[in-house]
């Protein structure tokens, strides 16, 4: 299973390239990659980039593919699935739980559905922490042609399997945390070094 990291966003709310912002001396994106590398079900990692940041991302040591569409999450997922089945996450999710990723991939393999997506009790989906079949790409292609870029709607109208989040270990929920603003960085205490516990730089 490919681990696809969507890393083509512009980070407008953050005020700069948040994926390269350093936390305890290490780029935010690297935390996401390292957590994904710890998942036993992930065989290789691919970074889905924009044309603008593709060269910078090659420094992270993984294959980089360019999202030519730049229509949001759907375009990134569509691009990733050109390479095969993929577990897709956003690059700004530094608290990924490897065991949770493995759990989702196992459910995906068992269910044999086009997608396997975590779902909250209120119906809210987590499409950027989910497993997708390469066959789902054909379904997305029709959406893209009609300019319907709503990924949650596409998932709901496909024959997806869902993982009920409230039935899982509560500690796994931190896996969904993503950094949108600089204020969000204050929640990243687990990533600070022991020697520099109060420094985010």
Curated annotation (Swiss-Prot):
Binding-site residues for GTP, renumbered to this chain: 6-8, 18, 67, 92
Catalyses which reaction(s): Mo-molybdopterin + GTP + H(+) = Mo-molybdopterin guanine dinucleotide + diphosphate
Positions with a binding annotation for Mg(2+): 92
BP GO annotations: Mo-molybdopterin cofactor biosynthetic process
Segments passing through the bilayer: none
Gene3D superfamilies: Spore Coat Polysaccharide Biosynthesis Protein SpsA, Chain A
Pfam families listed in its UniProt record: NTP_transf_3 (PF12804)
Keywords annotated in UniProt: Cytoplasm, GTP-binding, Magnesium, Metal-binding, Molybdenum cofactor biosynthesis, Nucleotide-binding, Transferase
Cofactor requirement: Mg(2+)
Main localisation: cytoplasm
Subcellular location(s) per record: Cytoplasm
Gene Ontology MF terms: GTP binding; metal ion binding; molybdenum cofactor guanylyltransferase activity; nucleotidyltransferase activity
Functional summary from the UniProt entry: Transfers a GMP moiety from GTP to Mo-molybdopterin (Mo-MPT) cofactor (Moco or molybdenum cofactor) to form Mo-molybdopterin guanine dinucleotide (Mo-MGD) cofactor.
Domain notes: The N-terminal domain determines nucleotide recognition and specific binding, while the C-terminal domain determines the specific binding to the target protein.
Family membership: Belongs to the MobA family.
Name recorded for this polypeptide: Probable molybdenum cofactor guanylyltransferase
């Amino acid at each position: 299973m490919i681990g696809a990291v969507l890393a083509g966003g512009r980070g407008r709310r953050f005020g700069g390239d948040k994926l390269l912002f350093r936390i305890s001396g290490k780029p935010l994106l690297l935390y996401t990659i390292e957590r994904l590398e710890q998942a036993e079900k992930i065989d290789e990692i691919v970074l889905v980039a924009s044309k603008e940041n593709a060269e910078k991302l090659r420094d992270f040591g993984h294959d980089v593919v360019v999202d030519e569409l730049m229509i949001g999450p759907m375009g990134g997922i569509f691009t990733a699935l050109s390479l095969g089945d993929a577990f897709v996450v956003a690059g700004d999710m530094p608290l990924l739980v490897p065991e949770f990723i493995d759990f989702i991939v196992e459910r995906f393999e068992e269910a044999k559905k086009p997608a396997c997506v975590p779902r909250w009790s209120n119906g809210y989906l987590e499409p950027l922490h989910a497993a997708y079949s390469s066959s789902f790409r054909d379904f997305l292609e029709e959406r893209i042609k009609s300019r319907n870029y709503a990924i949650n709607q596409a998932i709901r109208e496909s024959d997806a399997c869902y993982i009920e989040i409230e039935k899982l270990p509560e500690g796994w929920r931190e896996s969904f945390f993503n950094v949108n603003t600089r204020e969000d960085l204050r929640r990243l205490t687990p990533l600070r070094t022991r020697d520099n516990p109060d420094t985010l730089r």
